[in-house]
Amino acid sequence: MLKYAIIGFKSACDLLLLDMLLKTVREKTPNYGSNCFFAENATLIGDVVMGNDCSVWYQAVVRGDVHSIRIGNKVNIQDGAVVHATYQKSPTQIGNNVSVGHNAIVHG
């Protein structure tokens, strides 16, 4: 089944085919809330759950391939940032109203 999201933060813009952004790993596909923005070359992988009003910017990667990642509401993951988890040891949790800066690495 194809998934679509609206491009543009809280705006009605063109539809983007999300199959290129959302990668299923071990039968887990990223989930996200309403009013989220994903840049065209951002990537979300595996066991990722993201709240409402979030944004993932250019070349940012959220890797839930080895453990879960939980992201709250109103989170901004800026350009080039990487969010990851530790293999079979610790998940990554990001609360509400958080901004992850440009090129930052967040590792659970």
Give the label of every model feature segment.
Residues 16-18:
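Glycine-rich, low-complexity segments
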